[in-house]
């Protein structure tokens, strides 16, 4: 069967739902597809709750993690939407998922207000650089008291302001995902209002299309008879089929190959552009030669490194960080783009220890090379838990 060609007529934006478990992230995602399907049936297939809920599964640390990718269109834009799992255990995936967002819909149940995972997701969104947030105050049909709704809204705004989002100015839309899903016209209207807020408050991202191509690899699989496919979100540049690429990072040696095909949502593309989630077919590359954490680049435009200087913020105990200080030769994992690599920390002269809540500079030596450049962001993690966030300030080797 010939693959349908992807029409690139509208601007493309990556968004996702974040928030506490059971506040209605998946229901809202399903409701968005239903309401948009009812408005523009020719543009949007409806994705029922069950279909999103049984998202493709990924295993991490023995926990089964699912992340659903849904696509839909408003009149203005084409969206790729990730429904992030809500569990605190799934934060690893949130880091990979949230890293793919130009903006997020923070779902908060009006019946509960902000909960621990709400805070955690907002903190994480800030760390991984989700630039814009729109709030869906869900289950608003279940709260009759206007004052209570206003109070919850205020709480959410304060939480966002505390994490350096413009809490006073960003849109908070009262919705009922369930009622909209059941076809209630009033609540369907509220959902359209939410999507208008997303259209207007999450700016068209400045794409990095002018820069040389780079895509971090998230997943690798084999397609029988066609070869090895790597998937991920193109970070910058443009790649066309039959162009040469280089695979850099994790391994000692970089590999050169040719990209023989590009696809998105099972449709063939004539190019991969910065900001898009794509699959790249690589010629003559074995599955075992590629792994998550490598990057696909325009040959010669990025180099693997193991030693760097960085400026970091270590989370306080209240933010879910360490309870105790760390010392010279601390060995956590450094999470770059899509993967964790262990590294050894050297503290600056005169610094004996770093307390939770501190800002510091450090020198890090990784046990595996990572394609890096100055200003690249990373998370510092221990056993899957984020304990700090940083940026590369200088590459040593």
Swiss-Prot record:
Q: Where is this region: G5?
A: 176-178
Question: Domain tr-type G: where?
Answer: 10-206
Location in the cell: Cytoplasm
Catalytic reactions of this protein:
GTP + H2O = GDP + phosphate + H(+)
Task: Specify where it is mainly localized.
Answer: cytoplasm
Q: Which residues bind GTP?
A: 19-26, 83-87, 138-141
Detail which positions bind Mg(2+).
26
One Pfam entry name:
GTP_EFTU
Spell out the residue ranges making up region: G4: 138-141
Location of region: G1: 19-26
Can you list the GO cellular component terms from the UniProt entry?
cytosol
- Enzyme Commission number, as recorded: 3.6.5.3
| Keyword Membrane on entry | no
The segment annotated G3 runs over 83-86
Enumerate the GO terms in the molecular function aspect: GTP binding; GTPase activity; translation elongation factor activity
Note the superkingdom of the native organism. Bacteria
Task: State how it assembles.
Answer: Monomer.
- Sequence similarity: Belongs to the TRAFAC class translation factor GTPase superfamily. Classic translation factor GTPase family. EF-Tu/EF-1A subfamily.
Protein task: GTP hydrolase that promotes the GTP-dependent binding of aminoacyl-tRNA to the A-site of ribosomes during protein biosynthesis.
Q: What name does UniProt use for this protein?
A: Elongation factor Tu
What organism is listed for this UniProt entry?
Salinispora arenicola (strain CNS-205)
* Gene that encodes it: tuf
């Amino acid at each position: 069967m010939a693959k349908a060609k992807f029409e690139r007529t509208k601007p493309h934006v990556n968004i996702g739902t974040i928030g506490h478990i059971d506040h209605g992230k998946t229901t809202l995602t399903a409701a968005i597809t239903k309401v948009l399907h009812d408005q523009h049936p020719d543009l949007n297939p409806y994705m029922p709750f069950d279909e999103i809920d049984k998202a493709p599964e990924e295993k991490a640390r023995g926990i089964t993690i699912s992340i659903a990718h849904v696509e839909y269109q408003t009149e203005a834009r084409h969206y790729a939407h990730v429904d992030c799992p809500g569990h605190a255990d799934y934060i690893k995936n949130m880091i990979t998922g949230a890293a793919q967002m130009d903006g997020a819909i923070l779902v908060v149940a009006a019946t509960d207000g902000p909960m621990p995972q709400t805070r955690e997701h907002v903190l994480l969104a800030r760390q991984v650089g989700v630039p814009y947030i729109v709030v869906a105050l869900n289950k608003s049909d279940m709260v009759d008291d206007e004052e209570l709704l206003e109070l919850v809204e205020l709480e959410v705004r304060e939480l966002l302001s505390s994490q350096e989002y413009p809490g006073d100015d960003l849109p908070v839309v009262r919705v009922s995902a369930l009622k909209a899903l059941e076809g209630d016209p009033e609540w369907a209207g509220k959902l359209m209002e939410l999507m208008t807020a997303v259209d207007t408050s999450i700016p068209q991202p400045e794409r990095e299309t002018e820069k040389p191509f780079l895509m971090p690899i998230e997943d690798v699989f084999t397609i029988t008879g066609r070869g090895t496919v790597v998937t991920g979100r193109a970070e910058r540049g443009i790649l066309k089929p039959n162009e040469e690429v280089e695979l850099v990072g994790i391994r000692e040696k970089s590999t050169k190959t040719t990209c023989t095909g590009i696809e998105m949502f099972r449709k063939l593309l004539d190019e991969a552009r910065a900001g898009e989630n794509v699959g790249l077919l690589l010629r003559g590359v074995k599955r075992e030669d590629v792994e998550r954490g490598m990057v696909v680049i325009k040959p010669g435009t990025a180099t693997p490194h193991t030693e760097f200087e960085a400026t970091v913020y270590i989370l306080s105990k209240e933010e879910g960080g360490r309870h105790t200080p760390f010392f010279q030769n601390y060995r956590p994992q450094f999470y770059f783009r899509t993967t964790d690599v262990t590294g050894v920390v050297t503290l600056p002269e005169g610094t004996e220890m770093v307390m939770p809540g501190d800002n510091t500079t450090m020198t890090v030596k990784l046990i595996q090379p990572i394609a890096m450049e100055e200003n690249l962001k990373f998370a510092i993690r221990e056993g899957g838990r984020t304990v700090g966030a940083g940026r590369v300030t200088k590459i040593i080797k």
